[in-house]
Amino acid sequence: MDIQYLMRQAKKLEKAMADAKEKLAEIAVEAESGGGLVKVAMNGKCEITRLTVDPKAVDPNDKALLEDLVTAAVNAAVEKARTAADESMSKATGGIKIPGIAG
């Protein structure tokens, strides 16, 4: 085996992964709960970029409902963001699964 070749391949993979990680912020996913009463937009880094709450979801006598709706929407968005990030990183690594990367 040519060690120099392996080193070049490792450098290419490292660069591809770094580029893919930078692009995670450009990935956009959305999720909702309560039939659209709560909507969450998130990027591939699992950072919330927008959260909207329909006034119909705000009932001072039922705070728990709003909390549940927000929790459900955020969890759904996180799942979508992780899936999108995993797909992006998989493309960058040629399908090689690397533990601890994107997700």
From Swiss-Prot:
GO terms of molecular function: DNA binding
Compartment list: Cytoplasm, Nucleoid
Any one GO cellular component localisation term in the record: cytosol
InterPro entries: YbaB-like_sf (IPR036894), YbaB/EbfC (IPR004401)
Top-level division of the source organism's lineage: Bacteria
Gene3D superfamilies tied to this protein: Nucleoid-associated protein YbaB-like domain (3.30.1310.10)
Alphabetic keyword roster: Cytoplasm, DNA-binding
Function: Binds to DNA and alters its conformation. May be involved in regulation of gene expression, nucleoid organization and DNA protection.
NCBIfam families, A to Z: DNA_YbaB_EbfC (TIGR00103)
Family recorded in the similarity comment: Belongs to the YbaB/EbfC family.
UniProt protein name: Nucleoid-associated protein A2cp1_3777
